Amino acid sequence: MNFNHFDESGNAVMVDVSHKQPTLRTAVAAARVGMSPELLAAIREGGMAKGDVLGVARLAGIMAAKKTPDLIPLSHPLAIHSVAVDYELDSGAGTIQVRCTVRALERTGVEMEAMTGASLAALTIYDMCKGSDKSITIGDIRLLYKEGGKSGVYRREEGQ
């Protein structure tokens, strides 16, 4: 396996992407937040003491995607063109599926920005609800889709 974030001496380095041509890059990442059905109903109905949980989490996810190079040491600062955070609420399972989509015309992919956005949106849901339910879980953080660059399209298969 080739790890391109290390030089021949084993030192961590930022990958040089200056020779690459910018292409449209898209990445979609997700995270799952688990909670009691009662808490999910309160979030859905806007009944949380701290306010609009999903609205605040959406803003946190957008901000996090834009701040990725400040959080992940070897990621490149990118001119992100679009970040969207959306949700699927499953009352039966007591889960919120957070999805973050990032687009940019860049020389490197936006997977880490999408993963960071989904993760921080999920953490914000936890933060705003922890007073009501300490058993909230966050997990299943994963890349769902990416396109752009020479590696082409990646789409996670169901159950993968």
From Swiss-Prot:
Active-site annotation: D127
> What InterPro entries does the record point to?
MoaC (IPR023045), MoaC_bact/euk (IPR047594), MoaC_sf (IPR036522), MoCo_biosynth_MoaA/MoaC (IPR050105), Mopterin_CF_biosynth-C_dom (IPR002820)
Pathway-wise, it operates in: Cofactor biosynthesis; molybdopterin biosynthesis
Which SUPFAM superfamilies would you find in this protein's record?
A: Molybdenum cofactor biosynthesis protein C, MoaC
Q: Which UniProt keywords apply?
A: Lyase, Molybdenum cofactor biosynthesis
Q: What are this entry's molecular-function GO terms?
A: cyclic pyranopterin monophosphate synthase activity
Residues the record lists as binding substrate: L74, S75, H76, M112, E113
Q: Which cysteines are joined by disulfide bonds?
A: none
Catalytic activity, EC: 4.6.1.17
One Gene Ontology term from the biological process aspect of the record? Mo-molybdopterin cofactor biosynthetic process
Pfam families given in the database record: MoaC (PF01967)
Q: Which reaction does it catalyse?
A: (8S)-3',8-cyclo-7,8-dihydroguanosine 5'-triphosphate = cyclic pyranopterin phosphate + diphosphate
Report which superkingdom the organism of origin falls in.
Bacteria
Its quaternary structure? Homohexamer; trimer of dimers.
Role noted for this protein: Catalyzes the conversion of (8S)-3',8-cyclo-7,8-dihydroguanosine 5'-triphosphate to cyclic pyranopterin monophosphate (cPMP).
Q: Give the family from UniProt.
A: Belongs to the MoaC family.
HAMAP family given for it? MoaC_B
Instruction: State the name under which the record lists this protein.
Output: Cyclic pyranopterin monophosphate synthase
**Can you name the source organism?**
Pelobacter propionicus (strain DSM 2379 / NBRC 103807 / OttBd1)
